Design a protein with these regions (language model features):
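Short, cationic low-complexity segments
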Residues: 173-182
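Acyl-donor binding region in acyl/amide transferases
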Residues: 1-163, 169
């Protein structure tokens, strides 16, 4: 996966951040056609945080219940109509289970960031994701608020019917080291 992303993805490999799940999809001939890397959610994202409706304390306690799609790549030889949205929909249906098996806790919401100057987000729309707003053109390394990066559309997909209940549940005294489940 690393070499495929390094060679064919416009952002390169970069390596996953924190907890992560990687999906490599093969065609009927056994060739890799799609690469997906899911990782830890963005620490702060105003459109996502408003959509969820959580407080800063709830975000701190429950951010581990959100997965970020860090890379999504359809390889050049995998150009098949509707392949990207089909694979994306199937991958998100199994993401919570894969995360639970690997890390012992679920994820209830998926997020991704799409550069608006490069992509329209059609694949996400076709896979039932919701665009909830745009970033401000800053990055997590921008502590001084001077770094300019491309503005991105924020796309979200609930992975569980009760995702808001899981993310917004009242904090418990014992929750400092963990997160509730639905």
């Amino acid at each position: 996966m690393r070499s495929l992303l390094a060679r064919y993805h416009y952002l390169g490999y970069g390596g996953p951040v924190g907890e992560n799940v990687q999906h490599l999809v093969h065609d009927a001939r056994g060739r890799a056609v799609v690469v997906m890397v899911w990782g830890a959610a963005a620490w702060k994202c105003a459109p996502r945080d408003a959509f969820v409706g959580w407080s800063p304390a709830q975000r701190r306690a429950r951010l581990s219940l959100v997965a970020n799609q860090q890379r999504f790549l359809v390889l050049p030889w995998g150009r098949v109509p509707h392949l990207a949205s089909h694979v994306l929909a199937r991958a998100t249906r199994r993401l919570a289970r894969d995360w639970q098996e690997r890390y012992g806790h679920p994820v209830v919401l998926a997020e991704t960031f799409v550069e608006v100057e490069r992509f329209a987000g059609t694949v996400y729309r076709a896979a039932n994701w919701t665009c909830v707003g745009r970033t401000q053109g800053r990055s997590r390394q921008d502590r001084a608020r001077t770094l300019q990066v491309p503005v991105k559309a924020v796309w979200l997909l609930p992975l569980h019917v009760r995702f808001r209940a899981a993310l917004n549940a009242p904090l418990t005294a014992s929750e400092e080291g963990g997160a509730p489940c639905c």
